[in-house]
């Protein structure tokens, strides 16, 4: 059955493949997986129907109650890694977000612990603006076509919902100070002088950090509309 008993009793997945890039611009493809330390526990159809008739917010409530009681839920983070030359060794496209990388070893990266509930739901939850375009140096979007669309559409949606300066809000703001030529716009809380709001520019000293190199993928061929050849549907 597919209805989680609570959010603390379910796993999480990146769905899409991403790239991890080193200082030389070399990259590998990765998928991330959050494994619930509490284990997975789902409701039957009858249980889900009865419970959700009384409390449609049961999964959120169960998670918050666990935290309130001091039983802090945990998830282990795992990563699967494929080298670029391995992509064509499968009978499906590993960049297809509907596919699981069965047989590819998982490596544990760490553990996430939720040790408190939001002190202010609006400030810490409703204002949160998640988007797959919010990537730190060293992680890039793969060529997954669905992900490429989401990189634009999610950021655009959050810009419409929260505003062009959503990344200035404490819940979205990076830990390290952002130095860029972005300025102004509705609800701007930053302090800027000057009028240069683009990059590159010879009028200001702000430049891209050369130590963070993007990966390069050589391409050759023709654009076309064609059926997907390696589908492996329903497996």
PLM-predicted stretches and their roles:
Residues 1-235:
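Active-site-adjacent core segments of small-molecule enzymes
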């Amino acid at each position: 059955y597919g209805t989680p008993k609570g959010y603390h009793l379910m796993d999480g997945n990146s769905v899409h493949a991403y790239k991890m890039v080193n200082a030389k611009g070399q990259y590998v493809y990765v998928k991330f997986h959050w494994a619930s330390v509490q284990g997975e526990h789902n409701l039957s159809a009858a249980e889900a129907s009865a419970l959700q008739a009384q409390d449609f917010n049961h999964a959120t409530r169960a998670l918050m109650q666990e935290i309130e009681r001091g039983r802090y839920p945990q998830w282990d983070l795992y990563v699967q890694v494929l080298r670029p030359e391995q992509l064509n060794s499968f009978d499906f496209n590993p960049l297809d977000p509907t596919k699981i990388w069965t047989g590819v070893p998982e490596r544990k990266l760490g553990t996430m612990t939720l040790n408190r509930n939001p002190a202010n739901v609006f400030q810490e939850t409703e204002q949160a603006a998640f988007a797959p375009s919010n990537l730190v140096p060293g992680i890039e979007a793969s060529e997954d076509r669905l992900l490429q669309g989401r990189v634009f559409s999610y950021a655009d949606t959050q810009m419409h919902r929260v505003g062009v300066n959503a990344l200035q809000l404490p819940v979205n703001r990076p830990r390290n100070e952002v130095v860029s030529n972005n300025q102004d716009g509705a609800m701007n809380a930053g302090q800027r002088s000057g009028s240069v709001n683009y990059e590159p520019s010879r009028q200001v000293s702000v430049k891209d950090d050369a130590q963070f190199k993007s990966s390069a993928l050589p391409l050759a061929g023709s654009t076309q509309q064609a059926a997907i050849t390696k589908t492996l549907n329903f497996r």
